[in-house]
Amino acid sequence: MMEVEAARVLWRRSVQRHKLRYTTLLSDGDAKTFAELTKIKPYGEDIEIDKEECINHVSKRLGSALRNIVTDCRKRGVTLGGRGKGQLTQNAIRKMTIYYNRAIRGSNSVDSMKKAVMASLHHCFSTDDRPRHELCPTGVDSWCFFQEALAKHQVPGPHDKLVHTPLNEKKLTPHLMPIYKRLSEDQLLSRCVSGKTQNANECLHSLIWARCAKDHFASCKRVQFAVTTAARV
């Protein structure tokens, strides 16, 4: 609740102290702060506060969802993350998370973002016998090795080497598709279009906590000193 209370104070005093309004909240996925600001309406009924998502935190949701589905299926006696070929290994999950982040970061509209997200999944399913690159970007600058080779009038290389062991589409699609559909919904992606992250904020926080550990009590002067010196770095 500390973040909620801090936001309540910052938003309510912004006009009086700084003569400005904070009309956008860059969220890390925690809905409590945004819900509170929507409730108290610090700038009145006519001025709404919009919510945008940190694309790094959104990408982490995919990794968490994939690891959770592996764990849940294991409890039911279904192996998705074993060592066999085409399994949803930790390396595969890391790769898919990177692809998802790149799909969001490299798109400037909800439609293009949605297409890029699904392209990243189909790319991971692709094999020499059944290439699934129809949604991947075309051209010589494409991140997709298959489309890049076609644009250069070359024969694409082997999928086992360039996709790094394609995922078992038949086995994994029923488990992965609901996750990808949920994480490519218009409402979520519309909050990611600006491509913003909380990197700068988290970097500043790490500098502050290095000077004043947040798990120990500190005086007001100590906290002010930590904030001031961190901001000067």
Regions found by a protein language model. Name each.
Residues 61-75:
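Short, surface-exposed amphipathic charged segments that create phosphate/polyanion-binding patches used
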Residues 8, 12-52, 56, 74-233:
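Acidic/histidine-rich catalytic cores and adjacent linkers
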Residues 1-7:
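Phosphate/oxyanion-binding active-site loops and adjacent basic polyanion-contact surfaces
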